[in-house]
């Protein structure tokens, strides 16, 4: 066995010791005050009449879940810290991987919002050169998260020695690449030799004495030359890295909690930008910026400054990262319109990238919409979650259904230690040598491109990039042998250069049509009420906007009201709200919001209809769609027996339990038609129902039913053929067992058809209408504790309407 085979373990041990030694002094703080409540600023906590109570962090706890508290302490810098870098460290002893559900804080220092504190960001630099005896007021706006019930709050002041910590990162960054490097390869051997020599220079016999610090300095000088100069300058592979924190607008939390998450995370980003001049950050979703602007305008102004400096990139295209399966085409256009307009007006930035890392599939109509909205590029990672088939390309042209092509790149970042054979990649990347090398190995278009995009940082309240990631970036920017060379680059810069690099390259592949996501198939149907409300409001807005335009000579166009309504629609199309993958509380909020929107739209619409509709006894019907329609129209409480158009055509009116209906022909697109009220004309009934009620003849079909209310035959008279296959039933309701392997509200798994029950418990089978416009069959069935109600309308049209309700 060669000594060198153990060098990685030797170096690892020394690095661990240096990490511990870098924390040179620690001073406990214990005399805190606590007050329950969700306060925005210190003055709000002071204005609350409830008193602050003493909180001894050595013996007391605070309690959740889903609770807010305000902590306060006045601390003095110990004299031992005079002239030293002063850090604050916060710990709750909750260390689970999912920071989205763990306690989170926003730190105020002397009344000023300073930094978010979370599992990944526990240390805050208060002063690079502290003054002994100086006093600070430290305050923590605190949220417990939704998972745990009891917490510590352990806060200390500490000195972190920059030279010891610097040597730690000098050594640990190349060391962390070893698992991805070929064991007998030149790069690993070179790095091992250099690190071994550095270890030999370090004198750990008496930490913090003169000899110790001389050895630390000698080791750093040696590495600066032997590693970061002599083994640097390599550019064979580039990793374009952009800091990022993907924040779901709702998911395991409500939108109200997202307002807090974005403030904490963006405050952390801004604080680290003060400490690391090369740090660049990108964030999409103008909705998040709007939340910050409302709550902490001083932080928002800092972002504006960083954008102007070229260090913060507001990019992404849409107002929120919206679902692209259920959202209508018009709403997708509005996502771009509102998103691009906000970033242009607020920051002077014209978005060119659609940034949707976490959305559950992408319609083939998107490339055309993107191109017409001024979007040139598309980025995602979610397709790497496919259940069965790995996406064959990572850089490609995406050709939409009309032939429009969009340059697309899938981020290939792996988790630390993750197999390169896995499908899965992440947009919450760790800027870590193992992850970056793995991302390059996973990348499939190496023949046309040597530059991969890395979005790195913890999301969903995790605060984005960490100091460790930024220290790693600083060293990997040197281009270490065997490692990708890191550069901090905006996503737009990356895509512009990628477009130039692959332009006219015949090896650039093309994907045509929908980018279907082979997973989370249940998101097409989960939380059906919420999905129905979204579609209803989309259609109501089409009505309102057209009628407002037509009536603006008589009634002022409601610009502010429409703008507010669209903001409400767009946020609720976020990819964990509309698909149904958020917690129950989210949908209690959207239920209320949709009801309020519908009431407002109805009032605005009625005001404009009243202004537009001519006086008199006639009936005016509006068609707000973009095509002429001939259809059955619900007429409310219309008393007419028949209606006549200007050409003399007479249309019978049929009374119903809800009012009246009529079939009206050739209603003009985006227009209206007024009908005169006339007496009914005698005509033959268009529907013939058998005496036993189990057969109906319409102008287009003959339909028969069995004893369960299921259709046993649908004969198409025009084409003279039976529609149903022999032995098959129509109007059959079948209930499948929904027990997916992993994600209950997301998934419908491939085996779902293995177990099912047919709904055959017929309670009512009654013909409730038979008139000149339609015949209606009312059916009720029981299943378990539910009742399924149908009113099947047979029309004097080629289609059959089946409104269905399930309690």
Where on the chain are the PLM-derived regions?
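The substrate-binding groove and active-site-proximal loops of carbohydrate-active enzymes
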Residues: 205-213, 245-260, 284-292, 317-333, ...
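Active-site and substrate-binding clefts of carbohydrate-active enzymes
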Residues: 129-214, 218-221, 234, 238, ...
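Gly/Pro-rich turn-and-neighbor structural signature
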Residues: 214-229, 287, 293, 330, ...
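Catalytic and substrate-binding regions of extracellular carbohydrate-active enzymes
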Residues: 559-563, 571-797, 801
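Catalytic alpha-helical scaffold of carbohydrate-active enzymes acting on polysaccharides/glycoconjugates
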Residues: 223-242, 264-276, 291-350, 364-372, ...
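Mature N-terminal, pre-catalytic/accessory segment of carbohydrate-active enzymes
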Residues: 1-242
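Aromatic/His-enriched, Gly/Pro-containing loop or helix-boundary segments
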Residues: 89-91, 108-133, 318-338, 346, ...
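Short "domain-exit" segments at the C-terminal end of structured domains
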Residues: 802-807
């Amino acid at each position: 066995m060669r000594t060198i085979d153990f060098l990685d373990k030797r170096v690892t041990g020394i690095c661990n010791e240096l990490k511990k030694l870098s924390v040179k002094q620690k001073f406990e703080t214990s005399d805190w005050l606590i007050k329950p409540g969700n306060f925005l600023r210190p003055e709000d906590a002071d204005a609350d009449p409830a008193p602050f109570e003493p909180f001894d962090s050595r013996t007391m706890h605070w309690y959740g879940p889903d609770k807010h508290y305000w902590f306060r302490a006045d601390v003095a810098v110990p004299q031992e810290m005079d002239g030293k870098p002063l850090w604050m460290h916060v710990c709750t002893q909750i260390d689970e991987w999912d920071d989205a559900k763990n306690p989170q804080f926003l730190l105020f220092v002397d009344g000023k919002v300073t930094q978010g504190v979370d599992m990944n960001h526990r240390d805050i630099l208060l002063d690079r050169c502290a003054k002994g005896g100086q006093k600070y007021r430290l305050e923590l706006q605190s949220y417990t998260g939704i998972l745990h019930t009891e917490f510590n709050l352990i806060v200390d002041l500490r000195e972190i020695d920059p030279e010891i910590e610097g040597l730690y990162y000098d050594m640990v960054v190349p060391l962390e690449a070893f698992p991805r490097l070929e064991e007998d390869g030149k790069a690993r051997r070179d790095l091992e030799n250099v690190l071994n020599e550095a270890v030999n220079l370090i004198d750990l016999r008496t930490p913090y004495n003169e000899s110790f610090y001389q050895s630390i300095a000698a080791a750093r000088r040696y590495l600066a030359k032997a590693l970061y100069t002599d083994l640097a300058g390599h550019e064979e592979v580039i990793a374009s890295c952009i800091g990022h924190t993907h924040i779901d607008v709702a998911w395991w939390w409500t939108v109200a909690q997202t307002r807090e998450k974005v403030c904490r995370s963006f405050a952390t980003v801004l604080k680290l930008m003060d400490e690391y001049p090369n740090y660049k950050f990108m964030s999409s979703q103008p909705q998040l910026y709007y939340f910050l602007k409302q709550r902490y305008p001083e932080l928002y102004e800092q972002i504006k400054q960083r954008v102007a400096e070229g260090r913060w990139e507001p990019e992404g295209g849409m107002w929120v990262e919206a679902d692209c399966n259920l959202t209508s085409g018009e709403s997708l256009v509005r996502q771009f319109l509102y998103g691009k307009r906000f970033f242009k007006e607020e920051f002077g930035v014209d978005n060119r990238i659609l940034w949707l890392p976490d959305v559950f599939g992408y319609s083939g109509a998107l490339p055309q919409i993107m191109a017409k909205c001024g979007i040139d590029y598309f980025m995602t990672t979610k397709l790497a979650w496919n259940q069965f088939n790995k996406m064959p390309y990572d850089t490609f042209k995406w050709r939409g259904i009309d032939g429009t092509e969009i340059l697309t790149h899938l981020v290939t970042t792996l988790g630390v230690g993750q197999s390169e054979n896995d499908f899965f990649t992440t947009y919450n990347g760790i800027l870590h040598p193992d992850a970056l090398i793995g991302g390059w190995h996973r990348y499939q278009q190496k023949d046309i491109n040597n530059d991969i995009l890395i979005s790195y940082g913890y999301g969903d309240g995790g605060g984005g990039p960490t100091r460790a990631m930024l220290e790693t970036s600083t060293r990997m920017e040197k281009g270490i042998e065997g490692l990708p060379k890191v550069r901090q680059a905006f996503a737009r810069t990356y895509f512009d250069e990628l477009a130039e690099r692959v332009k006219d390259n015949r090896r650039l592949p093309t994907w045509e049509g929908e980018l279907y996501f082979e997973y989370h198939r249940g998101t097409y149907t989960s939380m059906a009420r919420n999905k129905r409300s979204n579609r209803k409001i989309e259609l109501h807005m089409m009505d309102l906007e057209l009628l407002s335009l037509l009536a603006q000579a008589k009634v002022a166009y409601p610009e502010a009201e429409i703008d507010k309504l669209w903001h409400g629609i767009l946020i609720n199309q976020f990819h964990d709200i509309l698909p149904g993958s958020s917690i129950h509380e989210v949908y209690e909020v959207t239920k209320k919001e949709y009801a309020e929107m519908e009431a407002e739209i109805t009032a605005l619409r009625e005001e404009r209809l009243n202004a537009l509709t001519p006086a008199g006894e006639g009936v005016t019907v509006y068609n707000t769609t973009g095509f002429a329609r001939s259809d059955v129209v619900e007429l409310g409480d219309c008393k007419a027996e028949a209606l006549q158009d200007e050409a003399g055509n007479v249309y019978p009116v049929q009374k119903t339990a809800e009012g009246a209906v009529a079939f009206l022909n050739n209603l003009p697109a985006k227009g209206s038609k007024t009908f005169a009220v006339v007496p009914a004309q005698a005509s033959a009934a268009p529907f013939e129902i058998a005496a036993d009620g189990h057969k109906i003849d319409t102008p287009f079909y003959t339909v028969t039913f069995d004893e369960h209310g299921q259709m046993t035959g649908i004969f198409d008279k025009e084409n003279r053929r039976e529609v149903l296959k022999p032995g098959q039933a129509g109007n059959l309701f079948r209930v499948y067992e929904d027990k997916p392997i992993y994600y209950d509200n997301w998934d419908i798994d491939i085996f779902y058809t293995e177990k099912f029950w047919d709904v055959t418990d017929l309670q009512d089978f009654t013909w409730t209408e038979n008139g000149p416009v339609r015949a209606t069959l009312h059916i009720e069935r029981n299943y378990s504790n539910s009742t399924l109600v149908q009113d099947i309308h047979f029309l004097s049209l080629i289609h059959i309407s089946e409104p269905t309700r399930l309690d």
